[in-house]
UniProtKB/Swiss-Prot annotation:
The species this protein was found in: Encephalitozoon cuniculi (strain GB-M1) (Microsporidian parasite)
Pfam families: DUF2463 (PF09591)
InterPro entries xrefs: UPF0328 (IPR019081)
Family to which the UniProt record says this protein belongs: Belongs to the UPF0328 family.
Taxonomic lineage: Eukaryota, Fungi, Fungi incertae sedis, Microsporidia, Unikaryonidae
The protein, known as: UPF0328 protein ECU09_0020
Amino acid sequence: MDLINTSRLHETNKQFKNKNEATKLHWRTFFNNFGPFTSIIFSMLMYLIFSKNDFNGTPFLRFVGVLFPSLYSSMEYFLLLFDSWRSDHRVLLSLHGVLYLLLNTILFMFSFVTIISTIAFTASKWNDNDDPATFTMAIPSFFVSFAYLLSISCDFSAKSVLSIGMSTNVPIDLLILLIPIIGTILLIEKSRYHFYFFIVPAILIPVRSLKERYFVSGKSSLSVAPWRTMVFVFMLILGVFVYAFLAYGSVEILYQYLCSFNKPPSQLGNE
């Protein structure tokens, strides 16, 4: 009798665990599918509705303008770190384990820089004419696109950690990654077409997610082929470079903001 009760209890616990895992997977899928689109579109609406003077005079508007993209990207990095902590890779003492530790350090750095950048962008005065477009479209578009690509490229349940999928997805992934950078270059060059480049990732990300849902390609046996690994390494190196630049800019903004408290009122009024 005790053996039967123990078996039933074990089966009940297993069913409960499977139900919880299914709920978590459903929530994660919903977050990955709609989080990027919502974050990018909301920031763009802020840019279209409010003027430079509105942002410059209201810190709360600046905060809301960058909040959702920053929140989405930082949550993605924390979720990846949580997944990696639950995986078996952290116990490895080989070169693979060292690379795993390096990847986790990079993910933590990305999340930390995202949070610091949000504070810095809120504290900064958006005096330049291009500042609203930079802070509500260019940077959020990259934040969201890069975090999304990492979330679908890292699979800590696999032995290789890296899982890019079928080759048909890679061109879309490269477009999602590179188009915000091209849009930023056009913004710097004062091109009037920069807006369209920032909205493209908001369209491509749901398209890619729907493609994976309704035209499931599965994981190929070549998911860690050298060229796929090169794509991931290129993406990671580019991300480190961009986030290092953002970290430097954020520290400089915060330093100037803190130094402004020591300036006399007459000097502040002239700025």
